[in-house]
């Protein structure tokens, strides 16, 4: 009498696929930090942006990442100029 040993092993756990979703980058908190008519101290950030959506005007500096900041303490003013462009300036109070 001959026995034929035929063993078959089956998976005890079902194979599970992976997903390519489920992650996101942190928001950069871009936009206006000071509104029109608000007081800004020298060195304070007025507008965080990528590119020059808002252009620097009088008493406003532009950082390496295009962030606009006040060079002097004063009142923030936004104004339109040119063809659909916006500029921000800081008006120092009269002494």
Swiss-Prot record:
The N-terminus is cleaved by ribosomal processing cysteine protease Prp. One of its GO terms (cellular component) is cytosolic large ribosomal subunit. Keywords: Ribonucleoprotein, Ribosomal protein. The keyword Ribosomal protein applies. Belongs to the bacterial ribosomal protein bL27 family. HAMAP family: Ribosomal_bL27. This is Large ribosomal subunit protein bL27. The lineage of its organism: Bacteria, Bacillati, Mycoplasmatota, Mollicutes, Entomoplasmatales. The gene is rpmA.
